[in-house]
């Protein structure tokens, strides 16, 4: 079955992680015609080494590739280095620029390693922040949405301490996240999603018994969203609403509220979309797996599902 109908840019992520390997493994499962719609961004040397490890050298012959990101040869599998962090950002940035310029229709980026990127001296809290910075947008306009196991969960905050997240949460930030996620759901074939907003505190604060945060932040956001004509329930306790599984879209206030259910139900099959920007970008719902990099045992299921998700014919 053909799964790729649109032009895609595929950045290989951290070249010392499993990105080069899963990129090649996913591409191997596509037809030649489908591969012709995908341009790969990243150091060629890392792809060559991954191909040798996985005995896929012949795949490189018809690979459409653009060199992006410097890397010492050979790749240091599993090593967390500033050079690999810089390469990650360079390859993803080149792919985003290609999409912004109309050369491709969407961007897929393999896993990054945040420590490597920070060691390169680059402020980074995930692909959503990178997308916002490359596009010149405010980071409060771009969010992460995980898709997997029948769930769609947008995160209002992401890679920051709980203290920082609580200081940054506001009704407007929640509204921004939901509006971006509803637009994305339309692109994914769910035009009028039923939305559930998680509470910040347990039991959505239990009528202020556990704090004022939900009455001050999530409840006003829900009221605003309803006035915009959206079908929104909440705020509700995340545990209760996830157990019911009655909604099309869930809104997590904190990182673990959204990541735990997705990684429990779809550990190797989730997509991680950066939403709210004028470029469609997705990564996968797992990390760079430095502990198994360069061994040829990485699972490309999540990447292949992400390719299918973004490669589908629009409309």
UniProtKB/Swiss-Prot annotation:
GO biological process: phthalate metabolic process
Catalytic activity: (3S,4R)-3,4-dihydroxycyclohexa-1,5-diene-1,4-dicarboxylate + NAD(+) = 3,4-dihydroxybenzoate + CO2 + NADH
Binding site for a divalent metal cation: 159, 203, 255
An annotated Gene Ontology molecular function: metal ion binding
UniProt keywords, alphabetically: Metal-binding, NAD, Oxidoreductase
Superkingdom field: Bacteria
Listed EC numbers: 1.3.1.53
Alphabetical list of InterPro entries matching this protein: PdxA_fam
Similarity annotation: Belongs to the PdxA family.
Function in brief: Involved in the degradation of terephthalate (TPA) via the protocatechuate (PCA) 4,5-cleavage pathway. Catalyzes the dehydrogenation of 1,2-dihydroxy-3,5-cyclohexadiene-1,4-dicarboxylate (DCD) to yield protocatechuate (PCA).
The name this protein goes by in its record: 1,2-dihydroxy-3,5-cyclohexadiene-1,4-dicarboxylate dehydrogenase
């Amino acid at each position: 079955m053909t799964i790729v109908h649109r032009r895609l840019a595929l950045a290989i992520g951290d070249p010392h992680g499993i990105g080069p390997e899963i990129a090649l493994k996913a591409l191997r499962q596509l037809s030649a015609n489908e591969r012709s719609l995908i341009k790969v961004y990243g150091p060629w040397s890392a792809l060559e080494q991954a191909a040798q490890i996985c005995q896929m050298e012949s795949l490189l012959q018809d690979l459409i590739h653009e060199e992006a990101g410097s890397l010492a040869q050979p790749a240091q599998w599993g090593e967390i280095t500033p050079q690999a962090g810089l390469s990650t950002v360079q390859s993803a940035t080149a792919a985003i620029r290609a999409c912004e310029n109309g050369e491709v229709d969407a961007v897929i980026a393999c896993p990054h390693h945040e420590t490597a990127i920070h060691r390169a001296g680059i402020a980074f809290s995930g692909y959503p922040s990178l997308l916002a910075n490359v596009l010149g947008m405010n980071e409060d306009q771009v969010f992460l949405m995980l898709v997997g196991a029948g769930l769609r969960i947008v995160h209002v905050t992401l890679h920051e301490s709980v203290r920082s997240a609580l200081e940054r949460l506001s009704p407007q930030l929640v509204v921004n996240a939901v509006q971006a996620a509803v637009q994305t759901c339309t692109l994914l074939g769910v035009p009028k999603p039923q939305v559930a907003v998680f509470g910040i505190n347990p039991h959505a604060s239990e009528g202020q018994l556990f704090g004022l945060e939900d009455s001050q932040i999530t409840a006003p956001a829900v009221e605003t969203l309803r006035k915009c004509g959206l079908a929104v329930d909440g705020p509700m306790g995340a545990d209760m609403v996830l157990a019911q599984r009655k909604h099309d879209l869930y809104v997590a206030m904190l990182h673990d509220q959204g990541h735990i259910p997705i990684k429990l139900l779809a550990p190797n099959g989730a997509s991680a979309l950066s939403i709210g920007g004028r470029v469609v970008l997705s990564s996968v719902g797992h990390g760079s797996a430095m502990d198994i990099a360069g061994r040829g045992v990485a699972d490309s299921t999540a990447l292949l599902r992400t390719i299918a998700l973004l490669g589908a014919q629009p409309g």
